[in-house]
Design a protein with these regions (language model features):
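Terminal presequence/propeptide segments associated with secretion/organelle targeting
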Residues: 1-343
């Protein structure tokens, strides 16, 4: 929804297109990556393979009384944790995508709210403004974001249970009769944070900063954050069960397969990744080679699609086949390659 709103505005205005090109590409890439991952999970039958692994683990545990004592409840613990948290996780995702990653004014308000005005030096405030606020306004269009906010408010109301909606929805229902476009227009009309100078003045004056509590954008941001915090509280026990279950399950697998090298979860860590370059079989009777060449540019190039449009000069250069030392033995220009290592 956000991408469609952005795209429409980008097609109508070169200024907006330039401002939002990178943001749109990033959002689109994230969306397409999710589609690809889900497709990969299905095609590679990952869920079926994991179920087989769990069944083998359960059978192995059942063969020994000591194993039953240590690992007997592991799979139940994991199922309980994931089942009890899945709905809350979905709701948190809606709120996060719609507000923290959707309407940019909420992100802006959150950045400002995160500043410790009284505990920061003037130099620290200046650095914050230079590193965060100035870049924000460089590629921002308030009128476009207003449309996004209205759309995000609407979809959250449609998809999130009433008891988990941020409190701001009660105000919107009462004061604006559920008219999200009217509410969004009011937020953008009355907020004081759509000006770099206003923000700078606010952050350098604790008395002005205190008035931020009454700002409609800050009110929305705080309401969303409170809801996310409440959801986090509701999933605390579930995530404890998951963490405990994963720890015991991994320990059990290491015991079950002592000769097998099992990798630990290195997510969000600094790590060196090892792998190999190679082709890929996505489905029966199909094979993807390990590299692409310039031919693929012509096969995918589409002048009617802004995502697959290629500058005519680039196409002419490729047609000349003057690749010099970069050509392979067949005279092709190898461009990309596949590997199975993490990045």
């Amino acid at each position: 929804i956000k991408q469609a709103i952005w795209k429409d505005a980008m097609l109508k205005s070169d200024e907006v297109r330039i401002k939002y090109a990178s943001k749109y590409a990033g959002s689109s890439n994230y969306w397409k990556n999710s589609i690809g991952m889900n497709k990969g999970l299905a095609n590679l039958k990952v869920i079926e393979r994991k179920r087989e692994e769990e069944a083998a683990f359960a059978a192995w545990v059942a063969q020994d009384a000591k194993r039953k004592e240590v690992y007997g409840d592991v799979l139940n613990l994991l199922e309980k944790g994931y089942t009890s948290s899945s709905e809350y996780k979905k709701i948190s995702t809606y709120l996060g995508e719609a507000f923290l990653s959707g309407a940019e004014i909420v992100k802006l308000a959150r950045m400002i709210q995160s500043v410790d005005v009284k505990g920061s030096t003037p130099e620290e405030i200046d650095i914050f403004l230079e590193d965060n606020i100035k870049p924000f306004f460089k590629d921002y269009d308030a009128s476009l974001d207003q449309k996004v906010l209205a759309a995000m408010m609407k979809i959250v109301k449609e998809r999130v249970p009433a008891e988990n909606l941020p409190d701001i929805y009660k105000k919107v229902d009462k004061k604006y009769k559920g008219d999200y476009e009217k509410y969004a227009a009011d937020v953008f009309k009355k907020t004081s944070i759509l000006s770099y100078d206003n923000i700078a003045s606010m952050l350098k004056d604790p008395k002005k900063y205190a008035k931020l509590k009454k700002d409609p954008a800050a009110e929305l941001s705080l309401s969303v954050l409170i809801s996310l915090f409440e959801l986090q509280q509701l999933t605390g026990d579930s995530y404890y069960d998951i963490a405990k279950g994963e720890r015991l399950y991994f320990a059990g697998l290491k015991e079950m397969y002592p000769e097998k090298a099992l990798s630990s979860d290195a997510n969000f860590t600094m790590r060196v990744s090892y792998g190999s370059i190679g082709g890929y079989r996505p489905y029966d009777a199909a094979w993807y080679d390990y590299y692409t060449t310039e031919k693929g540019i012509f096969e995918k190039e589409n002048p009617e699609s802004d995502e697959f449009w290629v500058q005519p000069e680039i196409l002419d250069l490729i047609r000349s086949k003057n690749f010099g030392q970069y050509a392979n033995k067949d005279g092709e220009l190898q461009l990309c390659f596949l590997s199975n290592n993490d990045i």
